[in-house]
């Protein structure tokens, strides 16, 4: 005579015989019954490992995306070390002393060359037209810069020492002042748009002497006025 299980009298609706319980337990372990091993609320709400793995496969994390991008080769970006990526630089022309002297002499006479003159000069010197054109452009830029610095110095009234230094250091201004009419004297010299009255003697007579302020100098400067007045009488 077998013993009776008291649970069959207490909960007849939920009572299962031992063979049925064994079958259900084996089915749960084999098929996971919807991937949940128990019917507790916490176990039901907890995501299953299979679902989490599937979600990771569909939605990779940003960190994994960044790592894939960093490790993947960039086929579109060119190699910086390759010779094709480097810009080709033109070789700088090295002029001989004779060529430079002839270019300087031509520039002193003519600051701007026509196309025909430039071609003739290039042919005569054994250079290309582009080389002569480039040299003239650079030389004009230097010439304009020197002229601008000279204008800035001359715009200061009474700056005689600066003018002397400028003439000694710049051949352009020495030739410019020497070539002025009336013995190199300027009555009204416009500098930077403003008239600046000053008298500049020729470059070869630019010497700071102590006798410039002597009484004899004033007498010599006043003597033409005395002669003019005597002739008028």
From Swiss-Prot:
Coiled coil: none annotated. It is found in: Nucleus. Residues 50-85, 224-233 have a biased composition (Polar residues). Residues 88-147 bind DNA. Signal peptide: none annotated. Keywords: Developmental protein, Differentiation, DNA-binding, Homeobox, Nucleus, Sexual differentiation, Transcription, Transcription regulation. One of its GO terms (molecular function) is RNA polymerase II transcription regulatory region sequence-specific DNA binding. SMART domains: HOX. Residues 50-93, 206-233 are annotated as: Disordered. GO terms for biological process: cell differentiation; negative regulation of apoptotic process; nervous system development; regulation of transcription by RNA polymerase II; sex differentiation. The keyword Cytoplasm does not apply. InterPro entries: HD (IPR001356), HD_metazoa (IPR020479), Homeobox_CS (IPR017970), Homeobox_TF (IPR050848), Homeodomain-like_sf (IPR009057), HTH_motif (IPR000047). The keyword DNA damage does not apply. Its main location: nucleus. One of its GO terms (cellular component) is nucleus. Cell-type specific anti-apoptotic transcription factor required for the sexually dimorphic survival of the male-specific CEM (cephalic male) sensory neurons during sex determination. In hermaphrodites, the homologous cells undergo programmed cell death due to transcriptional repression of ceh-30 by tra-1, the terminal regulator in the sex determination pathway. This is Homeobox protein ceh-30. The gene is ceh-30.
